[in-house]
């Protein structure tokens, strides 16, 4: 962009008639060109006088900060010796050891009451039944079911008589209801072959 075009765009920016693209161009050019910055400063002073605004003394803060940064010495670089890496490794190992010891101590404190309770409970010896496996069979016959078990108590027979009826009713009702659940897909093992 030519010098005259930049000054015209700068004048349009000062009159608040420039669009965003022109404003960006002027700001980018002012960042690189000190003469354009001084022109902008003069235009700003002329605008303030024409609008009868109070004028402040010229303060170029950006130039003062740039000069101060240029005069400042660069900070010294940290030495990268082998001891620095060993120190970091030692700190990491110490933190890891402290965490592991804390976890172990915490778990031991929780385990002590449980171990004390386990030591005071009496051990119950269960009788072991030795014999062949018992197979139970169910049939649809109206006659009495054949019981293969060794028990002859009548209080367990009602389970053997009613269980097939309950299973059959369950399968029929779950198929009728048509609900979307896992239970309709469960099959009774004794009714599957019928």
UniProtKB/Swiss-Prot annotation:
Cited Pfam families: RseA_C (PF03873), RseA_N (PF03872)
Coiled-coil intervals: none
One Gene Ontology cellular component annotation held by this UniProt entry: plasma membrane
GO biological process, one term: alginic acid biosynthetic process
Similarity section: Belongs to the RseA family.
Function: Negative regulator of the sigma factor AlgU. Plays a role in the differentiation of P.aeruginosa into the alginate-producing form. Inactivation of mucA causes a switch from the non-mucoid to mucoid state resulting in constitutive expression of alginate biosynthetic genes.
Name this polypeptide is given: Sigma factor AlgU negative regulatory protein
């Amino acid at each position: 962009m030519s010098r005259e075009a930049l000054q015209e765009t700068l004048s349009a920016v000062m009159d608040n008639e420039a669009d965003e693209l022109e404003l960006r161009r002027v700001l980018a050019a002012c960042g690189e060109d000190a003469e354009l910055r001084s022109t902008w400063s003069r235009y700003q002073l002329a605008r303030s006088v024409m609008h009868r605004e109070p004028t402040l003394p010229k303060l170029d803060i950006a130039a003062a900060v740039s000069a101060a940064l240029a005069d400042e010495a660069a900070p010294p670089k940290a030495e990268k010796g082998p001891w620095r890496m060993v120190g970091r490794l030692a700190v990491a190992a110490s933190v890891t050891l402290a965490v592991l010891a804390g976890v172990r101590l915490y778990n031991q404190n929780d385990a002590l009451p449980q171990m004390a309770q386990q030591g005071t409970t009496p051990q119950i010896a269960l009788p072991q039944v030795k014999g062949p496996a018992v197979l139970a069979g169910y049939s649809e016959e109206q006659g009495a079911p054949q019981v293969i078990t060794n028990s002859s108590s009548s209080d367990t027979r009602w389970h053997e008589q009613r269980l097939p009826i309950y299973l059959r009713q369950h399968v029929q009702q779950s198929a009728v209801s048509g609900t979307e659940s896992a239970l309709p897909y469960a099959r009774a093992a004794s009714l599957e072959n019928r």
